[in-house]
Protein backbone atom coordinates (compact mmCIF):
# COMPACT_ATOMS: atom_id res chain seq x y z
CA UNK A 1 0.00 0.00 0.00
CA UNK A 2 1.38 3.37 -1.04
CA UNK A 3 1.27 6.14 1.56
CA UNK A 4 -1.08 9.01 0.77
CA UNK A 5 0.50 12.21 -0.45
CA UNK A 6 1.14 14.22 2.71
CA UNK A 7 0.46 17.88 3.23
CA UNK A 8 3.56 20.00 2.70
CA UNK A 9 5.46 21.07 5.78
CA UNK A 10 4.21 24.38 7.14
CA UNK A 11 6.52 27.35 7.21
CA UNK A 12 7.89 27.45 10.73
CA UNK A 13 8.54 30.68 12.54
CA UNK A 14 12.06 31.00 13.89
CA UNK A 15 10.50 31.61 17.30
CA UNK A 16 9.99 28.16 18.88
CA UNK A 17 6.80 27.47 20.80
CA UNK A 18 8.49 27.17 24.22
CA UNK A 19 11.86 27.89 25.86
CA UNK A 20 12.48 24.13 26.11
CA UNK A 21 12.17 23.78 22.33
CA UNK A 22 14.48 26.76 21.83
CA UNK A 23 17.02 25.14 24.13
CA UNK A 24 16.76 21.84 22.24
CA UNK A 25 17.33 23.57 18.90
CA UNK A 26 20.31 25.53 20.24
CA UNK A 27 21.85 22.35 21.59
CA UNK A 28 21.42 20.60 18.24
CA UNK A 29 22.79 23.58 16.31
CA UNK A 30 25.91 23.68 18.50
CA UNK A 31 26.59 19.95 18.33
CA UNK A 32 30.30 19.24 17.81
CA UNK A 33 31.50 17.29 14.80
CA UNK A 34 29.73 16.15 11.65
CA UNK A 35 25.99 16.86 11.74
CA UNK A 36 24.69 13.82 9.88
CA UNK A 37 22.22 11.48 11.56
CA UNK A 38 19.76 8.66 10.97
CA UNK A 39 16.50 9.18 12.85
CA UNK A 40 14.54 6.13 13.94
CA UNK A 41 10.96 6.77 12.79
CA UNK A 42 8.14 4.67 14.23
CA UNK A 43 5.36 6.72 12.68
CA UNK A 44 4.48 8.42 15.96
CA UNK A 45 4.61 12.08 16.93
CA UNK A 46 7.72 11.76 19.13
CA UNK A 47 10.07 10.43 16.47
CA UNK A 48 8.47 12.73 13.88
CA UNK A 49 9.26 15.85 15.89
CA UNK A 50 12.78 14.59 16.62
CA UNK A 51 13.41 14.46 12.88
CA UNK A 52 11.83 17.89 12.33
CA UNK A 53 13.96 19.52 15.03
CA UNK A 54 17.13 18.05 13.58
CA UNK A 55 16.19 19.27 10.09
CA UNK A 56 15.50 22.79 11.41
CA UNK A 57 18.79 22.74 13.31
CA UNK A 58 20.59 22.18 10.01
CA UNK A 59 21.43 18.49 10.24
CA UNK A 60 21.58 16.17 7.25
CA UNK A 61 18.85 13.71 8.25
CA UNK A 62 17.94 10.25 6.96
CA UNK A 63 14.73 8.57 8.13
CA UNK A 64 15.03 4.95 9.24
CA UNK A 65 12.17 2.59 10.08
CA UNK A 66 12.64 -0.95 11.34
CA UNK A 67 10.18 -3.50 9.95
CA UNK A 68 9.70 -5.76 12.96
CA UNK A 69 6.64 -7.92 12.33
CA UNK A 70 4.81 -9.44 9.39
CA UNK A 71 1.08 -9.33 8.81
CA UNK A 72 -1.55 -6.74 9.42
CA UNK A 73 -1.08 -4.50 12.43
CA UNK A 74 -0.60 -0.87 13.37
CA UNK A 75 3.13 -1.23 13.94
CA UNK A 76 3.85 -2.75 10.53
CA UNK A 77 1.41 -0.86 8.26
CA UNK A 78 0.12 2.43 9.69
CA UNK A 79 3.48 3.10 11.31
CA UNK A 80 5.39 2.61 8.07
CA UNK A 81 2.91 4.76 6.15
CA UNK A 82 3.13 7.61 8.64
CA UNK A 83 6.92 7.39 8.81
CA UNK A 84 7.12 7.61 5.01
CA UNK A 85 4.72 10.54 5.05
CA UNK A 86 6.79 12.43 7.61
CA UNK A 87 9.89 11.97 5.46
CA UNK A 88 7.96 13.38 2.50
CA UNK A 89 6.95 16.39 4.57
CA UNK A 90 10.50 16.98 5.78
CA UNK A 91 11.96 16.23 2.34
CA UNK A 92 14.38 13.65 3.70
CA UNK A 93 15.10 10.10 2.46
CA UNK A 94 13.24 7.22 4.10
CA UNK A 95 14.73 3.75 4.49
CA UNK A 96 12.96 0.61 5.73
CA UNK A 97 15.16 -2.04 7.33
CA UNK A 98 13.84 -5.59 7.47
CA UNK A 99 14.55 -6.61 11.06
CA UNK A 100 11.85 -9.26 11.37
CA UNK A 101 14.19 -12.21 11.85
CA UNK A 102 16.17 -10.40 14.56
CA UNK A 103 12.99 -9.30 16.34
CA UNK A 104 11.58 -12.83 16.26
CA UNK A 105 14.75 -14.40 17.68
CA UNK A 106 15.69 -11.71 20.20
CA UNK A 107 12.26 -10.63 21.40
CA UNK A 108 9.37 -12.93 20.51
CA UNK A 109 11.14 -16.25 21.14
CA UNK A 110 12.78 -14.96 24.33
CA UNK A 111 9.49 -13.52 25.55
CA UNK A 112 7.67 -16.81 25.09
CA UNK A 113 10.48 -18.71 26.80
CA UNK A 114 10.37 -16.33 29.75
CA UNK A 115 6.64 -16.77 30.27
CA UNK A 116 7.08 -20.55 30.10
CA UNK A 117 9.64 -20.27 32.91
CA UNK A 118 7.25 -18.34 35.14
CA UNK A 119 8.81 -14.89 34.82
CA UNK A 120 7.28 -11.69 33.46
CA UNK A 121 9.78 -10.54 30.82
CA UNK A 122 10.54 -6.93 29.96
CA UNK A 123 10.87 -6.96 26.16
CA UNK A 124 11.29 -3.19 25.69
CA UNK A 125 14.73 -2.85 27.30
CA UNK A 126 15.97 -5.96 25.50
CA UNK A 127 14.56 -4.64 22.23
CA UNK A 128 16.32 -1.30 22.66
CA UNK A 129 19.65 -3.04 23.24
CA UNK A 130 19.49 -6.01 20.87
CA UNK A 131 17.22 -4.80 18.09
CA UNK A 132 16.46 -1.09 17.76
CA UNK A 133 19.77 0.63 18.47
CA UNK A 134 21.87 -2.32 17.32
CA UNK A 135 20.06 -2.61 13.97
CA UNK A 136 19.88 1.13 13.32
CA UNK A 137 23.53 1.80 14.10
CA UNK A 138 24.74 -1.22 12.14
CA UNK A 139 22.62 -0.48 9.05
CA UNK A 140 23.32 3.26 9.08
CA UNK A 141 27.06 2.68 9.29
CA UNK A 142 27.08 0.04 6.55
CA UNK A 143 24.63 1.60 4.09
CA UNK A 144 24.85 5.34 4.77
CA UNK A 145 28.28 5.74 6.38
CA UNK A 146 26.49 7.41 9.29
CA UNK A 147 27.69 6.99 12.86
CA UNK A 148 24.90 8.70 14.80
CA UNK A 149 21.24 7.88 15.35
CA UNK A 150 18.46 9.85 17.02
CA UNK A 151 15.15 8.66 18.45
CA UNK A 152 12.08 10.16 20.09
CA UNK A 153 12.77 8.76 23.55
CA UNK A 154 12.10 10.95 26.56
CA UNK A 155 15.54 10.65 28.14
CA UNK A 156 18.76 12.65 28.21
CA UNK A 157 22.43 11.88 27.67
CA UNK A 158 25.20 13.93 29.22
CA UNK A 159 28.01 13.19 26.80
CA UNK A 160 31.50 13.35 28.26
CA UNK A 161 32.41 16.15 25.84
CA UNK A 162 29.43 18.31 26.91
CA UNK A 163 30.34 21.65 28.53
CA UNK A 164 28.04 21.21 31.56
CA UNK A 165 29.61 19.30 34.46
CA UNK A 166 28.71 15.68 35.03
CA UNK A 167 26.86 14.65 38.17
CA UNK A 168 28.99 13.28 41.00
CA UNK A 169 28.10 9.60 41.38
CA UNK A 170 28.73 7.09 44.20
CA UNK A 171 31.31 5.21 42.11
CA UNK A 172 33.89 5.96 39.42
CA UNK A 173 32.25 7.74 36.48
CA UNK A 174 35.15 9.76 35.08
CA UNK A 175 35.14 9.87 31.28
CA UNK A 176 31.76 8.15 30.93
CA UNK A 177 28.66 9.25 29.08
CA UNK A 178 25.76 9.50 31.54
CA UNK A 179 22.13 8.51 30.93
CA UNK A 180 19.57 10.74 32.64
CA UNK A 181 15.82 10.76 33.09
CA UNK A 182 13.73 12.82 30.68
CA UNK A 183 12.47 16.02 32.27
CA UNK A 184 8.83 15.01 31.73
CA UNK A 185 8.30 12.75 34.73
CA UNK A 186 5.15 11.27 33.19
CA UNK A 187 6.96 10.25 30.00
CA UNK A 188 10.51 9.49 31.19
CA UNK A 189 11.76 6.37 29.36
CA UNK A 190 15.20 6.00 30.92
CA UNK A 191 13.96 2.84 32.66
CA UNK A 192 13.92 1.07 29.28
CA UNK A 193 17.36 2.34 28.25
CA UNK A 194 19.53 1.20 31.18
CA UNK A 195 21.02 -1.67 29.16
CA UNK A 196 22.63 0.43 26.43
CA UNK A 197 26.42 0.46 26.25
CA UNK A 198 28.82 3.38 26.48
CA UNK A 199 29.57 2.91 22.79
CA UNK A 200 25.88 3.30 21.92
CA UNK A 201 25.39 6.32 24.21
CA UNK A 202 28.28 8.04 22.44
CA UNK A 203 26.39 7.78 19.13
CA UNK A 204 22.82 8.55 20.23
CA UNK A 205 20.84 11.80 20.38
CA UNK A 206 17.54 12.27 22.22
CA UNK A 207 16.15 15.62 20.94
CA UNK A 208 13.05 15.44 23.17
CA UNK A 209 14.82 14.82 26.47
CA UNK A 210 14.02 18.26 27.87
CA UNK A 211 10.51 18.56 26.42
CA UNK A 212 7.17 17.53 27.87
CA UNK A 213 4.71 15.50 25.84
CA UNK A 214 2.44 18.56 25.67
CA UNK A 215 5.30 20.63 24.23
CA UNK A 216 5.99 17.90 21.69
CA UNK A 217 2.37 17.96 20.53
CA UNK A 218 2.36 21.76 20.42
CA UNK A 219 5.57 21.94 18.41
CA UNK A 220 4.44 19.17 16.03
CA UNK A 221 1.27 21.14 15.30
CA UNK A 222 3.36 24.25 14.68
CA UNK A 223 5.24 22.28 12.06
CA UNK A 224 2.03 20.87 10.62
CA UNK A 225 3.29 17.31 11.03
CA UNK A 226 0.75 14.69 9.99
CA UNK A 227 1.34 12.80 13.23
CA UNK A 228 0.76 15.79 15.54
CA UNK A 229 -2.59 14.49 16.80
CA UNK A 230 -1.96 10.78 16.35
CA UNK A 231 -3.06 8.76 19.35
CA UNK A 232 -0.33 7.20 21.42
CA UNK A 233 -0.10 3.45 21.88
CA UNK A 234 -0.73 2.43 25.49
CA UNK A 235 0.63 -1.10 25.25
CA UNK A 236 3.52 -3.19 23.98
CA UNK A 237 3.87 -3.24 20.20
CA UNK A 238 3.19 -6.99 20.33
CA UNK A 239 -0.10 -6.37 22.11
CA UNK A 240 -1.04 -3.76 19.50
CA UNK A 241 -0.10 -6.15 16.71
CA UNK A 242 -2.09 -9.12 18.05
CA UNK A 243 -4.94 -7.10 19.55
CA UNK A 244 -3.98 -7.83 23.17
CA UNK A 245 -1.19 -9.42 25.17
CA UNK A 246 -3.49 -12.35 25.92
CA UNK A 247 -4.01 -12.92 22.19
CA UNK A 248 -0.24 -12.90 21.65
CA UNK A 249 0.33 -15.43 24.43
CA UNK A 250 -2.54 -17.63 23.26
CA UNK A 251 -0.96 -17.67 19.80
CA UNK A 252 2.28 -19.15 21.16
CA UNK A 253 1.35 -20.97 24.36
CA UNK A 254 -1.45 -23.55 24.64
CA UNK A 255 -3.79 -23.23 27.61
CA UNK A 256 -2.50 -25.25 30.55
CA UNK A 257 -4.80 -25.40 33.55
CA UNK A 258 -3.37 -25.37 37.04
CA UNK A 259 -4.09 -24.41 40.61
CA UNK A 260 -4.14 -21.10 42.43
CA UNK A 261 -2.90 -21.73 45.96
CA UNK A 262 -2.09 -19.91 49.17
CA UNK A 263 1.49 -19.95 50.47
CA UNK A 264 0.60 -22.92 52.72
CA UNK A 265 -0.55 -24.91 49.67
CA UNK A 266 -4.31 -24.54 50.18
CA UNK A 267 -6.07 -24.56 46.79
CA UNK A 268 -8.32 -21.52 46.33
CA UNK A 269 -8.89 -21.51 42.57
CA UNK A 270 -7.81 -22.56 39.07
CA UNK A 271 -6.12 -20.84 36.16
CA UNK A 272 -5.65 -21.39 32.40
CA UNK A 273 -1.94 -20.54 32.29
CA UNK A 274 0.56 -18.88 34.61
CA UNK A 275 1.62 -16.61 31.74
CA UNK A 276 -1.58 -14.60 32.25
CA UNK A 277 -0.53 -13.53 35.77
CA UNK A 278 2.14 -11.27 37.20
CA UNK A 279 3.54 -10.57 40.66
CA UNK A 280 1.48 -8.08 42.64
CA UNK A 281 -1.67 -8.68 40.58
CA UNK A 282 -4.89 -8.42 42.58
CA UNK A 283 -7.66 -8.02 40.02
CA UNK A 284 -8.82 -10.74 37.66
CA UNK A 285 -7.70 -13.71 39.77
CA UNK A 286 -11.13 -15.32 39.72
CA UNK A 287 -10.81 -16.24 43.40
CA UNK A 288 -13.42 -15.59 46.07
CA UNK A 289 -11.71 -15.16 49.44
CA UNK A 290 -12.42 -13.41 52.71
CA UNK A 291 -9.88 -10.69 51.87
CA UNK A 292 -8.16 -9.50 48.68
CA UNK A 293 -5.34 -11.75 47.49
CA UNK A 294 -2.21 -10.77 45.57
CA UNK A 295 0.00 -12.90 43.34
CA UNK A 296 3.33 -13.43 45.13
CA UNK A 297 4.94 -16.19 43.03
CA UNK A 298 4.57 -18.06 39.74
CA UNK A 299 5.71 -21.68 40.11
CA UNK A 300 6.39 -22.87 36.57
CA UNK A 301 7.51 -26.36 37.62
CA UNK A 302 4.24 -27.06 39.44
CA UNK A 303 2.15 -24.83 37.12
CA UNK A 304 0.83 -22.98 40.16
CA UNK A 305 -0.07 -19.37 40.87
CA UNK A 306 0.72 -18.61 44.53
CA UNK A 307 -1.29 -15.87 46.22
CA UNK A 308 -1.38 -14.20 49.64
CA UNK A 309 -3.13 -11.39 51.51
CA UNK A 310 -1.36 -8.04 51.26
CA UNK A 311 -0.03 -8.36 54.81
CA UNK A 312 1.97 -11.42 53.66
CA UNK A 313 2.86 -10.15 50.17
CA UNK A 314 5.61 -7.66 51.00
CA UNK A 315 9.21 -8.48 50.18
CA UNK A 316 12.40 -7.08 51.70
CA UNK A 317 15.08 -7.79 49.12
CA UNK A 318 15.81 -9.21 45.71
CA UNK A 319 18.73 -10.44 43.64
CA UNK A 320 19.42 -8.66 40.36
CA UNK A 321 21.54 -10.28 37.66
CA UNK A 322 22.95 -9.38 34.23
CA UNK A 323 23.61 -5.88 35.61
CA UNK A 324 24.78 -3.19 33.21
CA UNK A 325 26.56 -0.29 34.88
CA UNK A 326 25.83 2.37 32.28
CA UNK A 327 26.92 5.67 33.88
CA UNK A 328 29.49 4.48 36.41
CA UNK A 329 31.93 1.65 36.99
CA UNK A 330 30.69 -1.34 39.05
CA UNK A 331 30.89 -0.57 42.79
CA UNK A 332 33.01 -2.77 45.04
CA UNK A 333 31.06 -2.06 48.24
CA UNK A 334 27.48 -1.38 49.31
CA UNK A 335 26.02 1.90 48.04
CA UNK A 336 22.73 3.71 48.61
CA UNK A 337 20.54 4.00 45.52
CA UNK A 338 17.03 4.79 44.40
CA UNK A 339 15.49 1.84 42.57
CA UNK A 340 12.67 1.59 40.08
CA UNK A 341 11.26 -1.94 39.73
CA UNK A 342 8.43 -1.19 37.28
CA UNK A 343 8.08 1.40 34.53
CA UNK A 344 5.15 3.16 36.18
CA UNK A 345 6.36 2.76 39.77
CA UNK A 346 8.21 5.51 41.58
CA UNK A 347 11.78 5.13 42.82
CA UNK A 348 12.30 3.62 46.28
CA UNK A 349 15.33 3.74 48.58
CA UNK A 350 17.54 0.66 48.86
CA UNK A 351 21.04 -0.53 49.65
CA UNK A 352 22.84 -2.20 46.76
CA UNK A 353 25.45 -4.83 47.60
CA UNK A 354 27.58 -6.51 44.89
CA UNK A 355 27.45 -10.33 45.02
CA UNK A 356 29.00 -13.15 43.03
CA UNK A 357 27.58 -13.63 39.54
CA UNK A 358 26.07 -16.89 38.34
CA UNK A 359 27.81 -19.10 35.80
CA UNK A 360 24.99 -18.29 33.36
CA UNK A 361 25.54 -14.55 33.70
CA UNK A 362 29.30 -14.95 33.29
CA UNK A 363 28.83 -17.12 30.20
CA UNK A 364 26.61 -14.40 28.73
CA UNK A 365 29.35 -11.82 29.42
CA UNK A 366 27.11 -10.18 32.05
CA UNK A 367 29.27 -10.81 35.14
CA UNK A 368 27.74 -8.23 37.49
CA UNK A 369 25.14 -9.17 40.09
CA UNK A 370 23.83 -7.51 43.24
CA UNK A 371 21.38 -7.74 46.11
CA UNK A 372 18.93 -4.92 46.76
CA UNK A 373 17.71 -4.48 50.33
CA UNK A 374 14.74 -2.13 50.45
CA UNK A 375 14.12 0.39 53.22
CA UNK A 376 10.43 -0.53 53.12
CA UNK A 377 8.66 -3.70 51.99
CA UNK A 378 7.78 -3.83 48.30
CA UNK A 379 4.76 -5.55 46.76
CA UNK A 380 5.40 -5.80 43.02
CA UNK A 381 8.97 -7.07 42.68
CA UNK A 382 8.71 -9.34 39.66
CA UNK A 383 11.30 -11.81 38.32
CA UNK A 384 12.04 -10.95 34.70
CA UNK A 385 11.38 -7.24 35.11
CA UNK A 386 14.18 -4.69 35.39
CA UNK A 387 15.46 -3.05 38.54
CA UNK A 388 17.04 0.24 37.50
CA UNK A 389 19.31 2.15 39.89
CA UNK A 390 19.32 5.95 40.07
CA UNK A 391 21.19 8.75 41.81
CA UNK A 392 18.78 11.68 41.49
CA UNK A 393 18.11 11.90 37.71
CA UNK A 394 21.12 9.84 36.60
CA UNK A 395 20.79 6.18 35.69
CA UNK A 396 23.63 4.33 37.42
CA UNK A 397 22.74 0.97 35.91
CA UNK A 398 20.21 -1.81 36.07
CA UNK A 399 19.59 -5.50 35.60
CA UNK A 400 16.96 -8.21 35.62
CA UNK A 401 15.30 -9.34 38.82
CA UNK A 402 16.22 -13.00 39.30
CA UNK A 403 15.05 -13.82 42.81
CA UNK A 404 12.73 -12.18 45.35
CA UNK A 405 13.18 -12.78 49.07
CA UNK A 406 11.92 -11.96 52.54
CA UNK A 407 14.32 -10.77 55.22
CA UNK A 408 14.96 -14.34 56.36
CA UNK A 409 15.77 -15.65 52.85
From Swiss-Prot:
GO cellular component annotations of the record: cytoplasm
Keywords: ATP-binding, Cytoplasm, Disulfide bond, Nucleotide-binding, RNA-binding, Transferase, tRNA processing, tRNA-binding
SUPFAM superfamilies referenced in this protein's UniProt entry, alphabetically: Adenine nucleotide alpha hydrolases-like
Domain of life: Bacteria
Disulfide links within the chain: 127-237
Annotated binding of ATP, by residue: 40-47, 66, 152
Gene Ontology terms describing biological process: tRNA wobble position uridine thiolation
Pfam families: tRNA_Me_trans, tRNA_Me_trans_C, tRNA_Me_trans_M
Gene Ontology molecular function: ATP binding; tRNA binding; tRNA-uridine 2-sulfurtransferase activity
Main location class: cytoplasm
EC number: 2.8.1.13
Annotated segments matching region Interaction with tRNA: 187-189, 342-343
Enzyme class: transferase
InterPro entries reported for this sequence: MnmA-like (IPR004506), MnmA-like_C (IPR046885), MnmA-like_central (IPR046884), MnmA-like_central_sf (IPR023382), Rossmann-like_a/b/a_fold (IPR014729)
Catalytic reaction(s) noted: S-sulfanyl-L-cysteinyl-[protein] + uridine(34) in tRNA + AH2 + ATP = 2-thiouridine(34) in tRNA + L-cysteinyl-[protein] + A + AMP + diphosphate + H(+)
Compartments it resides in: Cytoplasm
Active site as annotated: 127 (nucleophile), 237 (cysteine persulfide intermediate)
Site entry: Interaction with tRNA: 153, 385
NCBIfam families given in the database record: PRK00143.1, trmU
Family according to the record: Belongs to the MnmA/TRMU family.
Described function: Catalyzes the 2-thiolation of uridine at the wobble position (U34) of tRNA, leading to the formation of s(2)U34.
Protein name per the record: tRNA-specific 2-thiouridylase MnmA
Protein species of origin: Prochlorococcus marinus (strain MIT 9313)
Classification lineage: Bacteria, Bacillati, Cyanobacteriota, Cyanophyceae, Synechococcales
Amino acid sequence: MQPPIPAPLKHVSRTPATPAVAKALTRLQCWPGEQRVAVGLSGGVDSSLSAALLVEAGWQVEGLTLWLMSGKGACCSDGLIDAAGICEQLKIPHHVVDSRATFQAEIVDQLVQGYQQGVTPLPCSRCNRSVKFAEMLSWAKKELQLHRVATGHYARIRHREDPEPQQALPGDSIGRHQLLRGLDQNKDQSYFLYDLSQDVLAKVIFPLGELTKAETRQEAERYGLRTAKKEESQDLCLADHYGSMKAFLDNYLPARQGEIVLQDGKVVGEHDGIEHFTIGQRKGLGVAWREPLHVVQLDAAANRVIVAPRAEAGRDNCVVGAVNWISMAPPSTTINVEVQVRYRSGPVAAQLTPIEATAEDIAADRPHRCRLTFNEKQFSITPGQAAVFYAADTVLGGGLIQQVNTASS
